[in-house]
């Protein structure tokens, strides 16, 4: 995890909020560093994590995780991390017969709109065991990323319904958290992605949006991060609070600074 980002969000592994939906979105840049941050953050916070990874392999996340001080292999072996590797699983679903329903069963079904099997997998993974108390603090669902489901033929409404069920189960029933990444097509004529992004934005408690610099590439400033807190329980004037920073990605860290305050500029 990145300590500077924790400071901006006012969170620590020792003090994690529960019942929250966090939306990560990236526009014309790669926002995957946010996924790695929250994955390592919740593992260090001793949370039970179900990671639906539709973009990269387990080894990729594990290598980055080791740089951030966590071992995904060890977390998976002790039962703290349940990792659904979409790249590998999709091959199994498409080219091998399955005796039991697979979380990605929708890939073999006409219309590819039913995410019931994926929801059931998440529900069974995160629900507490019947015997004794759970050794983990709270359950967390992490998805990287939902836009891939649209590319696989699932409609935006179906994805929103799926996320609504996940939020009701993980956030409300189990008092856990959900974190999901969605690409922001930013003005492109992608109606389905816009529906998905807008729908999730209204449901989210926290939105982190990364975007490239309007001036183009800069070796000392890699992009801009906007943080929006949404508090539906507060009066209208206090419901939303936002901050914007620029950032530079390093090998094992990400540094954040106010606009125009990069060391290269100063």
UniProtKB/Swiss-Prot annotation:
Keywords: Cytoplasm, Nucleus, tRNA processing. Pfam families: ELP6. It comes from the Eukaryota. One of its GO terms (biological process) is retina development in camera-type eye. The keyword Nucleus applies. Its main location: cytoplasm. The keyword Disulfide bond does not apply. GO terms for cellular component: cytosol; elongator holoenzyme complex; nucleus. InterPro entries: ELP6, P-loop_NTPase. It is found in: Cytoplasm; Nucleus. Pathway: tRNA modification; 5-methoxycarbonylmethyl-2-thiouridine-tRNA biosynthesis. PANTHER family: ELONGATOR COMPLEX PROTEIN 6 (PTHR16184:SF6). Component of the elongator complex which is required for multiple tRNA modifications, including mcm5U (5-methoxycarbonylmethyl uridine), mcm5s2U (5-methoxycarbonylmethyl-2-thiouridine), and ncm5U (5-carbamoylmethyl uridine). The elongator complex catalyzes formation of carboxymethyluridine in the wobble base at position 34 in tRNAs. Involved in cell migration. Belongs to the ELP6 family. Component of the elongator complex which consists of ELP1, ELP2, ELP3, ELP4, ELP5 and ELP6. This is Elongator complex protein 6. The gene is Elp6.
